[in-house]
Amino acid sequence: MDAAVSDDGWPPGFFDRQDRGDDADFYVPARLVTHIDEDAIAAVSELYDELGVPDGRVLDLMSSWVSHLSRKPSGGLVALGMNAVELQANPLADEVVVQDLNVDSRLPFQDASFDAVVCCVSIDYLVHPVEVLREAARVLRPGGVVVLTFSNRCFPTKAVRGWLATDEDGRVAIVRTYLERAGFEGVTTALRTKRRRGRDPLYGAWARSG
């Protein structure tokens, strides 16, 4: 485990953020832009395809106007995020839910109601990530997959302190620990893009529900 994570829990202040203001205020402006480059976006889509994400019902956590799936999921897509305008612009979404997971980590869905839960380049903003991922485990069907993708890009004032304080390898360790503490076993992590100067790296972490 990386030094950013202690053996008996998270270091004091790990989940503090520079901007302690209401997240709802921060996300009021609709940002109809992508936050990673084209190669990183392609890597997200390829990973989803490899894991069969589009072959069932999908929940996209902390979503926006694009979900980076190569096609519309056969079982439908629920996009949950902070900005209604962004979510309603998502062409793949069958249902949108506006919810701040930092205020309420409980997902408004029945047990075992999704085949995949994904979260793209947003895990670093959660102040209760383990609780949210336990909820992801609850709503996943047996054999369903949770997929977290992340890069080195973020809104630094809203990312948690522990994330900003470590390097990319440390962030991989953090995400693995989030998943393991949420009860997922057999977690896989990988760098999904080639290391190239000036390009965004894309890391993935995924696991199947029991």
Protein language model regions, located:
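Class I SAM-dependent methyltransferase Rossmann-like catalytic core
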Residues: 2-53
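Class I SAM-dependent methyltransferase SAM/SAH-binding core
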Residues: 39, 43-107
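Short alpha-helix
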Residues: 43, 166-189, 203
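A short acidic, Gly/Pro-enriched loop at the edge of an enzyme's catalytic core
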Residues: 104-117
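A short SAM/SAH-binding and catalytic strip from SAM-dependent methyltransferases
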Residues: 115-130
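A short glycine-rich, Lys/Arg-flanked "PGG" loop and its adjoining helix->strand segment in the class I
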Residues: 130-145
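Conserved class I S-adenosyl-L-methionine
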Residues: 145-176
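Core SAM-dependent methyltransferase catalytic element
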Residues: 182-184, 192-210
